[in-house]
């Protein structure tokens, strides 16, 4: 399964854990995509103003910036950017709903296999591409229950 109709997609990962960020970058690059990681959420605005990406993957719990606030900020900056939460919080219904209200398009627990995240990325990207073609919006994609 490919996250878009093209051969590759451009991803931005925002996670304060350098090990997780590196793992995701490596995984997505092995799948043929371009990928950049930020381990400091405060870098997001300047990065997005200078670069393009098709999907952002955001951690909820970071020491310097709250993931929910970051999602809201990103949504204001780019209303059409697909945002997927990838969090170690697990399936926390309150956090999930807060992320979705802030503008996230999907929610995945870090406790699930990486292939699950990839499937959610593919579905979110496909849904967002359909929206751009004026297809009625679909529900957010959730994969937090283990």
Predicted regions and their residues:
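The feature encodes the CheY-like receiver
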Residues: 21, 63
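C-terminal output helix
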Residues: 94-95, 112-122
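Active-site residues of response regulator receiver
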Residues: 59
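Acidic catalytic/metal-coordinating carboxylates
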Residues: 39-40, 66-69
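Alpha4 helix (beta4-alpha4-beta5 surface) of REC/receiver domains from two-component response regulators
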Residues: 69, 90-106
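Acidic, metal-coordinating helix/loop segments flanking the phosphotransfer/catalytic sites
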Residues: 37-55
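Hydrophobic/aromatic residues positioned on beta-strands within the core alpha/beta folds
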Residues: 86-87
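Short amphipathic alpha-helix used as the core "switch/output" element in two-component signaling
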Residues: 46, 68-80
């Amino acid at each position: 399964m490919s996250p878009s109709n093209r051969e590759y997609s451009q991803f931005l990962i925002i996670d304060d854990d350098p090990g997780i960020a590196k793992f995701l970058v490596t995984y997505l690059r092995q799948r043929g995509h371009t990928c950049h990681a930020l381990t400091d959420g405060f870098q997001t605005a300047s990065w997005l103003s200078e670069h393009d990406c098709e999907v952002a993957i955001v951690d909820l719990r970071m020491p310097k910036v709250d993931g929910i606030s970051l999602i809201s900020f990103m949504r204001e900056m780019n209303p059409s950017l697909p945002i997927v939460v990838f969090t170690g919080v697990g399936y926390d219904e309150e956090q999930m709903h807060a992320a979705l209200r802030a503008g996230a398009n999907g929610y995945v627990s870090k406790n699930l296999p990486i292939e699950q995240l990839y499937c959610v990325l593919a579905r979110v990207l496909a849904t967002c591409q359909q929206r751009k073609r004026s297809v009625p919006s679909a529900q957010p994609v959730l994969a937090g229950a283990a």
